[in-house]
Structure formats: C-alpha cells, structure tokens
From Swiss-Prot:
<keyword id="KW-0805">Transcription regulation</keyword>
<protein>
    <recommendedName>
        <fullName>Repressor protein C4</fullName>
    </recommendedName>
</protein>
<keyword id="KW-0804">Transcription</keyword>
<keyword id="KW-0678">Repressor</keyword>
<comment type="function">
    <text>Repressor of the ant/reb gene.</text>
</comment>
<dbReference type="GO" id="GO:0003677">
    <property type="term" value="F:DNA binding"/>
</dbReference>
<keyword id="KW-0238">DNA-binding</keyword>
C-alpha cells in the first residue's frame, strides 16, 4: 500500500516520503493539486487528477490511522 501511494504521487509529479509527511506539507501538497482540476475530476475515470485524489485519500488514511 505504501509503495502504491508513493507511485501515485510520483505519477502526479510530486514525490512524497510517507515517513516525512507533516500536516503543513500535506496541506501544501493539497493546495498545489487543488487547482489542477480536483473538483472537475470524475472518480469513475483514470484521469490524472482522479489518480492524485486517490493517492491523497490513501495518504490521509495512513496518517490518521491509529
């Protein structure tokens, strides 16, 4: 799962080490990606924004998991 998340972020043009993610970095990444068309992305397609959104969701789940 970690490898898949890393690969997804690399596909988005952003490489994030899961072990080094901080809330500030996370929101900075989300702030950079949001203008790329998140709101217009269809999750039913394999579009790049949708893939980035999926990667972001996976990463958030990893961060908040007890």
């Amino acid at each position: 799962m970690l490898v898949r998340t890393t690969a997804d972020f690399r596909y988005c043009g952003i490489f994030v080490s899961v072990n080094r993610v901080t809330p500030e970095l996370w929101w900075g990444v989300m702030g950079r990606l949001r203008p790329a068309g998140f709101t217009n992305a269809s999750l039913s397609t394999l579009s790049r924004p949708a893939t980035c959104l999926t990667a972001g969701s996976r990463l958030l789940n990893l961060l908040v998991r007890p």
